[in-house]
Amino acid sequence: MRKIFLEAKGIQKSFGGVHALQGVDFKVHEGEILCLAGENGCGKSTLIKVLSGAHNADQGEVVINGHKYSNLTPQDSMREGIQVIYQDFSVFPNLTVAENIAMNWQIQEKKKLVNWKKVDEIAKSSMKNLGITLDLSLPVERLSVANKQVVAICRALLDNAKLIIMDEPTTALTSKEVAGLFEIIKKLQKKGIAVVIVNHKLEEVYDIVERLTILRNGKNVADGPIKEFDKKRFIECMTGREIETKYYRPKVENSEEIFSVKNLGRSGVFEGVSFTMHKGDILGITGLLGSGRGEIGEALFGITPPTEGEICLAGKKITIHNVHDAIQNGISYVPEDRLTQGLFLEQSIGMNTTIAAIRKYCRHFFLDYKMMRNEMVRWIKELNIAAPSPEPDIKTLSGGNQQKVVLAKWLDNSPKLLILNGPTVGVDVGSKADIHEILRKLAAEGIGIILISDDLPELEQNCNAVMIMKHGKTAGILRGDNIGQLSENLRD
């Protein structure tokens, strides 16, 4: 039986009137690989911050390696060997790989002159421990997401890590990169280092994780060996409800044509793309990284406008030179990265909801705030956004609810065509099901829906046609029950 390295007992934490953690118990054994799961807003992030000393618990205690803490500080946590790798990896983009890995060592040295040879030696040694090779002189901003993560792990090892907590480490990775990350985690385990993976995709972590702890509404709801959980039980524990798998297969053959493109292209990116959409259609676009799938959405919204081809919307030929043209013609776009492209993080939930259609709230050069607030409240209710009112900052919402706000922002513009690029990336299973239901309802109302995604189950369940992109060209369009053959058709 492995020794318990960390144990949190009866942790309670509130922010104002919101109870983020309500008597949570959590433990990690030495060298254990554990998954911490739960819907966005369940308390996972708050628990991580308590364990790292970033937040003090209102009640409860944390025991690390036999040492009891009632008010754990970041210094205490790091001294005990706890390292947290957040989704942004906390790297310095303009510094080199070596400088990032050896950063904490440089700070501890407290010297005015930097020993660059020593910095390189330390970074190289840390990478060697994991069997990894990266160009030490390369600025981190030029690395892939997966390699930025490797840099963060190497830095954690230099700080004598005994427990590494990874917050949603697979969100922005390809399946190949996920496999590479899991190989690194196995190497960490062999060195006796425990790893906590924060994740809400059971199928992704099933083969590497030993034990699973699930939180819901700030409370423990399940804990046990991973093999005791199938997908159905996992989802029910996380959401408190049963989520039925539905397949979207409407009959649209004789319905009204709402959108079409013919020989659409952008020089050097993609070419010869043609498709037609009818009322009720949800068209999926997929392909491997670099296939041109995301660039089609950006072209149709005018971010990087097409250089050739014909576009028809609602029976009318349109030209798109920029984003303004797209919006004026009734096209809306939900981007892949909501934090940097979809939201104003310093603004309220309500302002983010109405900002795209701000002109319709103007009355003689002034904003009609009463009208705006009524619409804000309507969208919160209609999209089931978990917010008490429109006034709180958007940052207070979970990822799934933030994504619903991005969706509301563009629906407030009354679009004829809605393009979504990876709309459920980093979204918990409950919010994911809600978003899918919203898209189906919109399609039934006559709004054209283009769903760009590499999540094959998402496409199979929610699209009645899927276009496959390969090397910037259309490789085929699957319809109806043939969509089940997606994985075979994606292979080169």
Model-derived features with residue positions:
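Glycine-rich phosphate-binding loops of nucleotide-dependent enzymes
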Residues: 2-492
